[in-house]
Amino acid sequence: MHDLKAIRDDAAAFGAAMRRRGLAGPEGADEGAAAPIRALDEERRRAQTELQGHETRRNELARAIGQAKRAGEDTTALEAEGTALRQSIETANAWLAESARKLDELLAVLPNVLDADVPDGPDETANVEQKRVGAPPSFDFEARQHFELGEALGLMDFAGAAKLAGARFTVLRGDLARLERALGQFMLDLHVNEHGYTEVSPPLLVNDATMYGTGQLPKFAEDLFRTTDGRWLIPTAEVPLTNLAAGEILDAASLPLRMTALTPSFRSEAGSAGRDTRGMLRQHQFWKVELVSLTTPEASADEHERMTSCAESVLERLGLPYRRMLLCAGDTGFSSAKTYDLEVWLPGQGAYREISSCSNCRAFQARRMNARYRPPQTGPKPAKPDFVHTLNGSGVATGRALIAVMENYQNADGSITVPDALRPYMRGCDRIG
């Protein structure tokens, strides 16, 4: 959600910020997407001023009627005016309530303002590579994709999953199921024991307000799964973890608040028809380790770098080649002000593919869910609460990490070497197949 006062104070700047996102606003409006917001806001402010005048006059009439009655004077005209005023006040209050709802609707579907250092560009082709870590493996055989390896081993069953649930699901068996579980446990242990995150086990079903708080609703309902009782399956643990602060005022001394969770994630992939139809890259259900941080406005940029480094350490411990990408304006997510994607090398595809996104959402989500903190007191009175900054990142997607391990650690005979970091979680198993 956006700060209405900031839009009011500089509608042109807000309009320019939305144009970076590809939102031009009404034709001919210099203020762009801010124009309808500012127009409705100004109309509301005029109506509020008029309402205050009506309420003042109503109070004056009440006193005048009382005085007239005590003096034995006729109050018919005064009472008629009072009746008309009550109707005007009721009408004005109803309009203000409806216009407030419309204003919220206008604001709720506008994306976050991007940081100044986010590059312009329409889509992923304009993303900027910042660094590469690790060299892609060199095989003396033709690298196979993960689904070819998994099916040949008899440990990855797409036909069985389709029988149970339809397309974009997978059944893992035996050592591949163990390997996926090992990846999740390894990541959790790393983030908790070395990076200072607190493990949380959150609900997988949440309500409308929770989805609204992190920005999934109202704009992206078609990307989500909804139950018959109106709850939503979480698309990422970011949703419940971040919303734990909804409506709270946190003590500044408790920040940064760092949380992690290993949960299933559920996505309809409504806009992905025809993309990655084979294998596990794009699933309706997948496991993911999520990282969430709540911090002060002054610390959020550094926290973003730290969180991204924590996610990178997973790939480095696993010996997986990757690159860090700074997303451009057209590829940055709705709630994010700045996002880094980590892309892991997949030899079977001969390409880097996303395995983690780490985003600084600034105060955007906090304003939607009213998550605040109280700065340290510096004067005679307690400091006024301010919105926290929220950050989230994959630390990392477990299913995609499984794919990356399979493809980067494959052998000529179709077996898979287990990375050293995972062997303690595999009871010493060093090879699958």
Curated annotation (Swiss-Prot):
Q: Which residues bind ATP?
A: 267-269, 354-357
Disulfide pairings: none
Q: Does the keyword Amino-acid biosynthesis apply?
A: no
Pfam families (UniProt xref): Seryl_tRNA_N, tRNA-synt_2b
Q: Which InterPro entries match?
A: aa-tRNA-synt_IIb, aa-tRNA-synth_II, aa-tRNA-synth_II/BPL/LPL, Ser-tRNA-ligase_type_1, Ser-tRNA-synth_1_N, SerRS_1_N_sf, SerRS_core, tRNA-bd_arm
Q: Name one GO biological process term.
A: selenocysteine biosynthetic process
Q: What is its main location?
A: cytoplasm
Q: Name one GO molecular function term.
A: serine-tRNA ligase activity
Keywords assigned by UniProt, alphabetized: Aminoacyl-tRNA synthetase, ATP-binding, Cytoplasm, Ligase, Nucleotide-binding, Protein biosynthesis
* Pathway(s) it belongs to: Aminoacyl-tRNA biosynthesis; selenocysteinyl-tRNA(Sec) biosynthesis; L-seryl-tRNA(Sec) from L-serine and tRNA(Sec): step 1/1
First-level EC class: ligase
Recorded catalytic reaction(s): these are: tRNA(Ser) + L-serine + ATP = L-seryl-tRNA(Ser) + AMP + diphosphate + H(+); tRNA(Sec) + L-serine + ATP = L-seryl-tRNA(Sec) + AMP + diphosphate + H(+)
Q: Where is this protein localized, as stated in its record?
A: Cytoplasm
Q: Which family does this protein fall into?
A: Belongs to the class-II aminoacyl-tRNA synthetase family. Type-1 seryl-tRNA synthetase subfamily.
Explain the purpose of this protein.
Catalyzes the attachment of serine to tRNA(Ser). Is also able to aminoacylate tRNA(Sec) with serine, to form the misacylated tRNA L-seryl-tRNA(Sec), which will be further converted into selenocysteinyl-tRNA(Sec).
What subunit structure does UniProt give?
Homodimer. The tRNA molecule binds across the dimer.
The domain section of the record reads: Consists of two distinct domains, a catalytic core and a N-terminal extension that is involved in tRNA binding.
Name of the protein in its database record: Serine--tRNA ligase
Organism per entry: Acidiphilium cryptum (strain JF-5)
* Species classification: Bacteria, Pseudomonadati, Pseudomonadota, Alphaproteobacteria, Acetobacterales
